[in-house]
């Protein structure tokens, strides 16, 4: 890589920001691109992979027997919470600070990743580049990747016919997972595997499948939305738009603010390390050498669960139930009464608490900042703001919640609702489009690093009881 003296001030500032952010060597910054290969994501990966392959070999050889912690009965019975057991390169979740994408926090991503003009929200294509390479991309690299995604976005006709075979009333996630399965006939990995590709090259068709899948998902998702809620009148892609803006356009929303929201939404929902249901499912299924289409379809079925991806639709429905019962001008005292009513009925306040986080989710904070900028007078946003003040003290008083603070789901539905995307039942599909970027990025590295079939040991309650007796 050749570095020129005439680098732009922006590149200097970005480089300096990375150096000063006290990060690990995970994130790299290249100031100037000098050849066509620098704009090609696959070429960049091809250069990076050998180094990381040597790194994992060294880690296994020198530290393979190092213990990472003790496994307790609580962990086994409690959904493996707190159990370190997965390698996930693309992101790491800190209980206090929240998610870091390749070492960068969300505020750092907003500052460093190339953004759309004039709004400034990071382009999702930039985060895809970051997750795959560990490098903050230039605007030229992001533009090249955006063009590549557009070139792969055409969806085969049979996919639409497969979706149309389902009742239009089928849940959007059912239709979405079905559409992804129909896309699977394109799989380059399956074809290469059947031809006997060497395992050291598994990552290459995995990359091709992953990029194509990411490119086509917004088209499939938008088709489902228009089929269900807009009389089947689909909207074609616009080759002048970036990934997030094009998705908003195909859904039928062309305002600059909605395009900005979609860029933000897709970016912050991409990845949340590897232990959540959808990410873990995708990784698990892919460990059997199932291709990215099969693996991501499985991940979507996990995402569709009420305890995972459906939470964002439940938040908006709950907020609307507050308005329905208490009126639009609900006071904080009324809110307190309604929250206690919810809790005393054995339910939870949706959008609050998190399995890992012990502070306010930074994904909530950046959505709140977006709302303060674009829709400060929206009644539902004002209600969400009041909930932010009222709910945590009540949950703290209750004493049973480790994290009383809002998570990402507490805010997203209100933003979407403001711009007219009011169909809460559909919201998890948006989540799925975004999450593909993180899951598929890691799948490429799973194959590049030669990660094995996942096969943890299971035990019975009798085994646990006997083991505990011996240990006492």
From Swiss-Prot:
Q: Keywords, A to Z?
A: Mitochondrion, Transferase, Transit peptide, Tricarboxylic acid cycle
Q: Which CDD domains match?
A: ScCit1-2_like (cd06105)
Give all cystine bridges in this chain.
none
Recorded hits in InterPro entries, A to Z, give: Citrate_synth-like_lrg_a-sub, Citrate_synth-like_sm_a-sub, Citrate_synthase, Citrate_synthase_AS, Citrate_synthase_euk, Citrate_synthase_sf
- What molecular functions are annotated in GO for this chain? citrate (Si)-synthase activity
Where does this chain mainly localize? mitochondrion
What Enzyme Commission number(s) appear in the record? 2.3.3.16
Q: What is this protein called?
A: Citrate synthase, mitochondrial
């Amino acid at each position: 890589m050749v570095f020129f003296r005439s680098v732009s001030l922006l590149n200097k500032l970005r480089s300096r920001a990375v150096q000063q952010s006290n990060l690990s060597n995970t994130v790299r910054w290249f100031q100037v691109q000098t050849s066509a290969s620098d704009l090609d994501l696959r070429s960049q990966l091809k250069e990076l992979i050998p180094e990381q392959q040597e790194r994992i070999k060294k880690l296994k050889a020198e530290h393979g027997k190092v213990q990472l912690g003790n496994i307790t009965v609580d962990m086994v019975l409690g959904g493996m919470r707190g159990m370190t057991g997965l390698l996930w390169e693309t992101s790491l979740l800190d209980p206090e600070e929240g998610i870091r994408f390749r070492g960068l926090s969300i505020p750092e991503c907003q500052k460093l990743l190339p953004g759309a003009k004039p709004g400034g929200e990071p382009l999702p294509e930039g985060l895809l580049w970051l997750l795959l390479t560990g490098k903050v991309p230039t605007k030229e690299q992001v533009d090249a990747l955006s063009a590549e995604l557009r070139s792969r976005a055409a969806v085969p006709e049979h996919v639409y016919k497969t979706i149309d075979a389902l009742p239009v009333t089928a849940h959007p996630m059912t239709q979405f997972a079905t559409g992804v399965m129909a896309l699977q006939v394109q799989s380059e990995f399956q074809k290469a595997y059947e031809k006997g590709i060497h395992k050291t090259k598994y990552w290459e068709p995995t990359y091709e499948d992953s990029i194509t899948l990411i490119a086509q998902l917004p088209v499939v998702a938008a088709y489902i939305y228009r089929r269900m809620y807009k009389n089947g009148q689909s909207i074609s892609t616009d080759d002048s738009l970036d990934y997030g803006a094009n998705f908003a356009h195909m859904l039928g929303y062309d305002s600059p603010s909605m395009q900005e929201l979609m860029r933000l939404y897709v970016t912050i929902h991409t990845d949340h390390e590897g232990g959540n249901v959808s990410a873990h499912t995708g990784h698990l299924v892919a460990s059997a050498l199932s291709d990215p289409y099969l693996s991501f379809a499985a991940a979507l079925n996990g995402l569709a669960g009420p305890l995972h991806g459906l939470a964002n639709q439940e938040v908006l429905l709950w907020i609307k139930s507050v308005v329905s019962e208490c009126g639009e001008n609900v006071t904080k005292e009324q809110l307190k009464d309604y929250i206690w009513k919810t809790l005393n009925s054995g339910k939870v306040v949706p959008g609050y608490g998190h399995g890992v986080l012990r502070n306010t989710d930074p994904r909530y904070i950046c959505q709140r900042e977006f709302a303060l900028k674009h829709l400060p007078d929206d009644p539902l946003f004002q209600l969400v703001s009041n909930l932010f003040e009222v709910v945590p003290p009540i949950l703290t008083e209750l004493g049973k919640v480790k994290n009383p603070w809002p998570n990402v789901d507490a805010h997203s539905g209100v933003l979407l609702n403001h711009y007219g995307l009011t169909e809460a039942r559909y919201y998890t599909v948006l989540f799925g489009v975004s999450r593909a970027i993180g899951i598929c990025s890691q799948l490429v590295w799973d194959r590049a690093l030669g990660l094995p079939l996942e096969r943890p040991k299971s035990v019975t309650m009798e085994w646990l009881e006997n083991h505990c007796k011996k240990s006492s």
